[in-house]
Amino acid sequence: SALLEAMEEEKVTVDGITHNLPVPFTVIATENPIGSSGTQMLPESQLDRFMICLSMGYPEHRDAVDILKNNGAKSLSGIQAVITSEDWKKLQKMAEESYVSEEMYDYIVRLTENTRNHPMLRLGASPRASLALLRMAKAMAVMKGRDYVTPEDVMDIYQEVLAHRIKLNMQAKAQGL
């Protein structure tokens, strides 16, 4: 619950004392395969708090060789920052201030609502999914150099935002979907 508090509220409570986390604050987590020692599935309500789900895939051959040569070293000393905290905050502010038309709000809500009534889904996208889709679409717009959201921005990130939030029903699984 401490991680969820940090993710949702950007603060943590230790021994009854609440501490604000630094801004910007970002959580990047990995997911081990179910069945691995010590792993348990997260409940849907907790999965829903993760904004996006990405598959990193396997490293390219050359990168895999480098990993072996470095003996899997965990040193972060060679990592160089690609953005400052101040620039990150500016980008976040730009995304927050991006214009969203009434039609775009309606579009996002319709996309998530449609998952709730789909005959092949046991669990559709929550209102939190709509919020995540909106935030990510705004970020996509900023990355493309715009201050307004388009349907293309939404569709560019739709799968990554919804994949971990919707669940197939037994019929869909039986059909191999």
Task: Please tell me what each predicted stretch does.
Residues G78-S130:
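Conserved AAA+ ATPase small/helical "lid" subdomain
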